[in-house]
A protein has these predicted regions:
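N-terminal Rossmann-like NAD(P)+-binding domain of SDR-like oxidoreductases, especially those catalyzing
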Residues: 1-122
């Protein structure tokens, strides 16, 4: 028996290495996928195989209002967006804090408001 699960998922950082693999697996299972990525480190090329099967939004997770508007339409969120370069983090402490802490807080706050489950990798 082949059951189609028609759920809507957001994947933050979906154009990155881990995120794009999550996106491809969700698409393979016939879910509706919304990729949220600001493309600072992710690449659209990573999504070329599924570009016609996803919605892509170039949004920064630090923007709570935009994130909340998107997540209110979802059944769940896979949060993979982050800045990860260790050397760069020493030079850009404030930016790394804003993205990795405040941005992640935005995802969890919106998930709480919208009663969503979050899969988070750290």
């Amino acid at each position: 028996m082949n059951i189609k699960c028609d759920m809507h998922f957001a994947v933050t950082g979906g154009a990155g290495f881990i995120g794009n693999n999550i996106v491809k697996n969700l698409v393979k299972k016939e879910h509706n996928v919304c990729v949220i990525d600001n493309l600072n480190t992710g690449k659209l090329e990573n999504l070329k195989d599924v570009k016609d099967k996803i919605d892509f939004l170039k949004i920064d997770i630090r923007n709570f209002d935009e994130i909340n508007q998107i997540l209110k339409k979802m059944d769940g969120v896979f949060h993979q967006a982050a800045l990860t370069d260790v050397q760069d983090s020493y030079r850009k402490k404030d930016e790394y804090y804003d993205v990795n802490v405040k941005g992640t807080r935005n995802i969890f706050e919106s998930a709480k408001i919208n009663n969503l489950k979050v899969v988070f990798a750290s």
